[in-house]
Amino acid sequence: MTRPRYSARPRIQLDGRPMRVEPGSSVAAALAARSPGNSRVSVSGEKRAAFCGMGVCHECRVLIDGRLRLACQTRCQEGMRVDTVLEHSTPPGVAPRHDAAANACDLLIIGAGPAGMSAALAAAPSGRAIVLVDDNAAPGGQIWRDGPGASIPAPARRLREQLTQYSNITLLCDTRVVGMAGLPGQRALMLENAREGWAQHYGALILCTGARELLLPFPGWTLPGVTGAGGLQALVKAGVPLRGKRLVIAGTGPLLLAAAHAAHRAGARVVRIAEQADWRALLRFAYRLHRWPAKAAQAVALFNPHYRTASHVLEATGDGRVQQVRLRRADGEETIACHRLACGFGLVPNIKLGQMLGCELDAHGGLHVDDVQQTTVPGIFAAGECTGIGGNERARVQGTRAGHAAVGELTQAARLSNDLARWQEFADALRGPFALRAPLLSLARPDTLICRCEDVPQSALAAHQDWTDAKLHTRCGMGACQGRICGAAAQALYGWQPLPPRHLLAPARIDTLAAIASSSGNSLD
């Protein structure tokens, strides 16, 4: 698979006005290039814009050609009509019906990042029918996300090319899982793309659902211009213009430096990188990096003179969008003027689909797997960041092992144990130095919104004892993102454990539900 070539600048209609956009850029990039750059208005009247940058938070939802889509996940195309006024209704009509028999495969792989691509390539020589699904426009996952501002590394290019060499691998990009199709145990998932929805039946399943950012609330975090650190990276790759803009990046973990590097390459002025960990913890971590020379070299290459330890965000302020950031330092406070603020407080595994299917978790909150990557549910395997945060090298080894095991090649899977142990040691080394310190868990004020979808403030949650109680009384976690942002935040802040989803993983269109009901012989009437 060759990387798409971006040539002519497509013309789109944005809120009824014609606009030329950069080739290959996302709709979120087009929104950011205009003034104002917000994509929607919240339930309490606040302006909002792209936040997570990777299809998790749903803040950037807009109407595209009459259908509700996520701006950060959709590439601009010639003649596309984008509308930020969400009161419009979806045009009538039911999606084309799929033949259930034609949508059956031997092996279904969810997620086409490093783990998913490696799993597909390991399983492909067996001749089994493989379907590889990803909600991005091209394979690569978040780490190798494509776009006009992306630089795709050689390992990603090789994996993409190898995928095209197997006729038994069907790649479905721009496609997401919205839930289970049928009853539990029927081995079918509900898939949906921009045009239609269908039930995808499978024999074995490999979950390579990756991870998402932990995004903690603080005063001003809902202002347009505030994003996640990984969200900033994703938006840069999608073509969001940053040249000459002043950026502050805050939070914890190696992702801060990676985001700063991406922003600098895009022409931004990164004026501060605030890492909450202290220098002693980072020094201990750096001392261990000699065991992984490539990681040590990467750390040196990403060094930035504006990096500060024992520093964290306190508040973002501005008129209609972020204009200033107040930071806590070891020796006091500082206020910095900026155009954008990117905050990331680490990564959390994407486990919801596995939980919905009955898979149990391990002690660190990832999907529990055995020595061949099988979860606690027979026939369901997992690989990559959904089993714990550990980097793309670990993900590729796990994916390869899962691919072999899923088609019965257990001897080949067992041979990878030593390789995996080396990268698992690196994953274990990541946990301690970047553990969140207590001050970051008390940044929110009573009026700070915890649930961005339903505009639920911290004060509304204070009287509740657990996640279910809070949902019932405040609608926290019941908006478009289905608790992916506020659920993880509430778990960090209050120790609440969100319950696994029951049947639906994400909001689904009526035509998708109708098509699946029809294919199963049921009716929505």
Predicted regions and their residues:
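C-terminal catalytic lobe of FAD-dependent flavoproteins
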Residues: 308-364, 426-494
